[in-house]
């Protein structure tokens, strides 16, 4: 077998293993990023020069009717098809993570010195001082307080000077901060997009805006805030438990078959409404702290998602003591299950729509903030 063929088979095998453990699917990252760009271009308050830049780096903006059709029928798959500009850069972090391989074998991203996959989440339970509390519980009793998250990457836990939690917990807050800073720097240097004669070719604002969109969107996926990122706690057989992470995101919208058309249509209606109604409640300027705050809010959706998964797979027992085997996934039971989140009862479908709409609003906010910061005079310390 030729070496190139063996290499491609290896990559495909790694993708098959890694894809279900990702964040929002490629299709969702593409759509959320494109929506953020389109909404800013349509907003009369967006600076004209920013609109011109967005148009040049996101040329595939669609109408809402076209976006609905995209959600209903577009097939993207593990290798994104027909995508360019900001939406393309918004899926690159997942492509890097998937081709890195398992564990710590991937190329280390600096200055974090960890593989790409460690930059997509922050497992909140690791910020508990007591080791026995560093796991997810249905009653949210192991959800830490904001003060427990150290400021610096190598800073110890405020209540245990011998414990540095970031090394295990994931470094999403620091990656968001880094991408934002790189976006501002490239905007200031007028490195707006890839062009001949500009080197390095892939060092430009469009790349970092796409990366920033990706990580901000990941931040709004509840499973990216917990060590139990597949909701295995809700199943008796932990090792073979269903991947609820994937059920929550890509399963509904991007597959080889025309699955769940009624649910997709219902979701789009709820999501389109959420885009008009959802407000970003996070006003914190410091991006690391703001990212942690988003994770802590999203964390509260996990019990509803876990209980919905038990219903969808007919898992017996209780959340604290699941019993017996499971059956096939029932998407209707899963997405229509209800629980309390953000002060009112919501279905899982509504939670998914809310989180995705929230991510669009946060991407818009940070892109606009970066543009305005890049235009402002640099103040010397």
PLM feature segments, named:
Residues 22-207, 222-381:
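N-terminal, motif-rich segments that launch catalysis or mediate targeting to/interaction with membranes
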Residues 1-9:
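Bacterial N-terminal signal peptides that target proteins for export
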Residues 205-219:
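Short alpha-helix carrying the canonical HExxH Zn2+-binding catalytic motif
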Residues 18-20:
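N-terminal signal peptide c-region/cleavage motif recognized by signal peptidases
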Residues 14-15, 37:
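Short, linear, compositionally biased motifs with a strong N-terminal bias
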Residues 12-14, 78-79:
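Alpha-helical interaction segments
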